[in-house]
A protein has these predicted regions:
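Single conserved hydrophobic/aromatic residue that forms the stacking wall/gate
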Residues: 1-8
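Mature extracytoplasmic or organellar-lumen-exposed domains after removal of signal/transit peptides
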Residues: 13-203
Length: 203
């Protein structure tokens, strides 16, 4: 869904730093499931074994628990985001859009056509913006749900965790970007969830 909305997802490390980290022998992996792979690196298996902390079987078990825990956390976040978007954000945005449409209709009924268009111009722009953001949110949430259904059928716990990281988690920022835009548009009295300023400064 392309609307020109900029998401806040930025690379944690720049390409320049990645090159410098490689030169220094530092790891700057940002994928959580892949970071857990380090538990199973031969040098770590040897170190844990020699110190009597964990044997190889225990390390594999611990890695599996970490992959499963990560997957469940992203699953929960995805379900909550979908619920908030579909059952809280979209209904409120739709009601505000209907209110604007009613206002425009009254302009059209009272004033001459050209004057009514001038008076309703800003409201019409808001109506279109709301429609675009609502469409993108609904499309992305539905796509996220279908993708989750496919991923949940995966048998390999590591591959499932990687799929949730690569295919589900990035959609959170995309959906949130459109919700943030609606938050700035919808009437404050109609918005049912706490806004950012309300989280920082209690009314």
């Amino acid at each position: 869904c392309v609307t020109g909305v900029q998401t806040c997802a930025l690379p944690i490390y720049s390409d320049e730093w990645k090159a410098e980290a490689t030169r220094r022998g530092l790891d700057c992996e940002t994928s959580v499931p892949l970071i857990f792979d380090r538990l199973l690196a031969q040098e770590n298996i040897r170190m844990f074994g020699e110190t009597g902390v964990l044997n190889e079987v225990e390390l594999h078990a611990r890695a599996e628990v970490k992959w499963e825990t990560y997957t469940k956390k992203v699953q929960i976040e995805a379900r909550i985001l979908g619920d908030l978007a579909m059952n809280h954000i979209l209904p409120v945005a739709s009601r505000y859009q209907s209110m604007l449409l009613d206002k425009v209709s009254k302009f059209m009924a009272i004033f001459p056509k050209e004057k009514a268009r001038v008076l309703a111009e800003q409201d019409l722009e808001l109506i279109e913006k709301i429609a675009r953001h609502m469409t993108c949110i609904q499309t992305q949430v539905e796509a996220m749900v279908e993708t989750r259904k496919v991923i949940n059928k995966m048998g390999d716990i590591r591959e499932k965790a990687i799929a949730y990281h690569d295919r589900i988690a990035p959609t959170f920022d995309e959906i949130r970007a459109h919700i943030d835009k609606l938050e700035l548009i919808v009437d404050n009295e109609m918005w049912t969830l706490p806004k950012y300023r309300e989280l920082l400064f209690l009314r």
